[in-house]
Swiss-Prot record:
<feature type="region of interest" description="Binding to host SKP1 protein">
    <location>
        <begin position="9"/>
        <end position="22"/>
    </location>
</feature>
<keyword id="KW-0945">Host-virus interaction</keyword>
<comment type="function">
    <text>Interacts with and disrupts the function of host retinoblastoma-related proteins RBR, which are key regulators of the cell cycle. Induces transcriptional activation of E2F-regulated S-phase and G2/M-phase-specific genes. Inactivation of the ability of RBR to arrest the cell cycle leads to the stimulation of viral DNA replication.</text>
</comment>
<feature type="short sequence motif" description="LXCXE motif, interaction with host RBR">
    <location>
        <begin position="111"/>
        <end position="115"/>
    </location>
</feature>
<protein>
    <recommendedName>
        <fullName>Cell cycle link protein</fullName>
    </recommendedName>
</protein>
<comment type="similarity">
    <text>Belongs to the nanovirus Clink protein family.</text>
</comment>
<comment type="subunit">
    <text>Interacts with host SKP1. Interacts (via LXCXE domain) with host retinoblastoma-related protein 1 (RBR1). Interacts (via LXCXE domain) with retinoblastoma-related proteins (RBR).</text>
</comment>
Length: 164
């Protein structure tokens, strides 16, 4: 129906509408390329057993920004899902940094306790969600039961994938 009215618009207005549409497409393509390039850089970190503190801070900031972007774009809750193959040292330190940014130093003991008593670590992927390190399968069941739509950024050894 909108196309029927579009054909009756003056040429200048048609051109302006088309240019705006093309700008949006180009902006989206540019952003996707930037995300792919950044993911490629951080994929190298997922292969390492030992990572510098600066890399942890950058990776944590990247994952926070990426999950916020996709949560807003898809209108879904976005989980950063860590596969078993990623070095424990890397994933714990990134989750610790995320926790620190949310809650500050005063609440860090709770995260340390969760790490020590983590349930079913060998059986499933983990995610940091609302102040705790959780089993992804259990969290997905809860989200499904509550009708919460979610998507995942999956961190595996040597890859970062977006699962919508």
């Amino acid at each position: 129906m909108a196309l029927r009215y579009f054909s009756h618009l003056p040429e200048e207005l048609k051109e302006k509408i088309m240019n705006e549409h093309l700008k949006e497409i180009k902006k989206k393509e540019f952003l996707e390329n930037v995300i792919k390039a950044a993911c490629a850089v951080f994929e190298g970190l997922t292969k390492k057993e030992s990572v510098e503190e600066d890399d942890i801070l950058r990776f944590s900031g990247f994952l926070e920004g990426l999950s916020a972007y996709y949560a807003e774009a898809t209108k879904k809750k976005c989980l950063v899902r860590w596969k078993k193959s990623v070095a424990i040292n890397l994933k714990w330190r990134v989750m610790e940094e995320m926790h620190y940014k949310l809650y500050g130093f005063a609440d860090m003991e709770d995260l340390y306790c969760s790490e020590l008593g983590f349930p079913n670590y060998g059986e499933d992927d983990v995610a940091y969600h609302d102040g705790a390190i959780v089993n992804c399968k259990q969290l997905e069941v809860v989200f499904d039961d509550l009708g919460i739509e979610f998507m995942s950024i999956v961190i595996d050894r040597g890859s970062i994938k977006i699962e919508l």
